[in-house]
Structure formats: C-alpha cells, structure tokens
C-alpha cells in the first residue's frame, strides 16, 4: 500500500470516529453529576403553554377595533 492511501484511510477513520462520537453525544444527553449544581430544566406543560400563548396573542377583547384610524402614507 502506498503511503498516500494509508494517510487517506487514517483520516477517514478519524473523521468516522469523531462523527460517531458526536452523534452519540447528541443522542444520549448526559445527566448532570449529583451535587454539581446543574439544575434539570423542566419543560412547561401544555396547559402552561396554552395560557402563555393566550396571554401573549390574546389582545383586549373589550377594545373597539372597527372604524379605526385611517392609515396615511408618510411621504
């Protein structure tokens, strides 16, 4: 085998090992060590998400929006 082929195979092996390690790291999220101070993040429940969405996008239901101010161009 030529030295060029050996170098290419070695680089491919390093890239494959690195990508496998990164894929494993992303797939298997490591748990924080006990007592490390890293708090586990809890995802909000669907009820909390719905309440937040209604509060953010809800608007004022008592406000009259018909016949509002005329929009005029600035130029």
UniProtKB/Swiss-Prot annotation:
Signal peptide from the UniProt entry: 1-20
Matching InterPro entries: Conjugal_tfr_protein_TrbK, TrbJ/K_C
Region (Disordered): 28-75
Cystine pairings recorded for this chain: none
Pfam family, one: DUF2749
Keyword Cell cycle among UniProt keywords: no
Keyword set, alphabetical order: Conjugation, Plasmid, Signal
Coiled coil feature spans: none
UniProt name for this protein: Conjugal transfer protein TrbK
């Amino acid at each position: 085998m030529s030295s060029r082929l050996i170098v290419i195979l070695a680089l491919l092996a390093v890239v494959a090992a690195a990508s496998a390690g990164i894929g494993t790291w992303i797939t298997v999220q490591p748990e924080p060590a006990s007592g490390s101070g890293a708090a586990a993040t809890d995802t909000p429940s669907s009820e909390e998400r719905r309440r937040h969405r209604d509060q953010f996008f809800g608007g004022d239901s008592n406000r009259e929006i018909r016949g509002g101010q005329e929009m005029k161009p600035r130029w």
